[in-house]
Curated annotation (Swiss-Prot):
This is Phosphoheptose isomerase. Coiled coil: none annotated. Pathway: Carbohydrate biosynthesis; D-glycero-D-manno-heptose 7-phosphate biosynthesis; D-glycero-alpha-D-manno-heptose 7-phosphate and D-glycero-beta-D-manno-heptose 7-phosphate from sedoheptulose 7-phosphate: step 1/1. GO terms for cellular component: cytoplasm. Homotetramer. CDD domains: SIS_GmhA. It catalyses: 2 D-sedoheptulose 7-phosphate = D-glycero-alpha-D-manno-heptose 7-phosphate + D-glycero-beta-D-manno-heptose 7-phosphate. Residues 34-196 form the SIS domain. It is found in: Cytoplasm. Its main location: cytoplasm. Belongs to the SIS family. GmhA subfamily. The lineage of its organism: Bacteria, Pseudomonadati, Pseudomonadota, Gammaproteobacteria, Alteromonadales.
Length: 197
């Protein structure tokens, strides 16, 4: 039992080391896109399933409230939180459309979709991406493994942040770190702090 616990920490550390080599450029590009989106008066919509739904809500909460610095709230919506909407769409249409229908209603050109899936193959997230593209939104995709079908939907103006792992738990751990990196970059770009203060 103790060895298994230690192995989980070791795997997590190694995955983060690998991600630190592979992901900074795509994280920086995604943060720049998000800053431009927010400066343009647009918003960021986020979606995912299970733990990825929690990540979508975490990201939205950090923007709407604050990350590490005092600042005005920033517009972000987690598409995972309204149980009446989610169950109505799932019941009347299908679970595959629970995010896409919200995007068709709320998404505007210039908005960003933060699409989160450890496998890259979640069908409702893929439909969300298709809806976002139809609304002239750009996409930041957080994936893992081989990127799945989500990777094939991305265009030149989109960005994929693919965690170099095949283990769902390790991918989720890095997704949270990526979200914190995005929030930190957004805050420090929009609201520069005096590092010596």
């Amino acid at each position: 039992m103790l060895e298994r616990i230690k192995d989980s920490f070791t795997e997590s550390i190694q995955t983060k080391i690998d991600a630190a080599e592979a992901l900074p450029d795509s994280i920086a590009k995604a943060a720049e896109m998000m800053v431009a989106c927010l400066l343009g008066g647009n918003k960021i919509l986020a979606c995912g399933n299970g733990g990825s739904a929690g990540d979508a809500q975490h990201f939205s909460a950090e923007l709407l409230n604050r990350y590490e610095v005092e600042r005005p709230p920033l517009p972000a919506i987690a598409l995972t939180t309204d149980s009446s909407t989610l169950t109505a769409i799932a019941n009347d249409y299908s679970y595959d459309e629970v995010f896409s229908k919200q995007i068709l209603a709320l998404g505007q050109p210039g908005d960003i979709l933060l699409a989160i899936s450890t496998s890259g193959n979640s069908s409702n997230v893929i439909k969300a991406m298709e809806a976002a593209l139809s609304r002239d939104m750009t996409i930041v995709a957080l994936t893992g493994k081989d990127g799945g079908a989500m990777a094939g939907l991305l265009g030149a103006s989109d960005v994929e942040i693919r965690v170099p792992s095949n283990v769902t738990a390790r991918i989720q751990e890095v997704h949270l770190l990526v979200i914190h990196c995005l929030c930190d970059n957004i805050d420090r770009t929009l609201f520069p702090q005096d590092e010596n203060a």
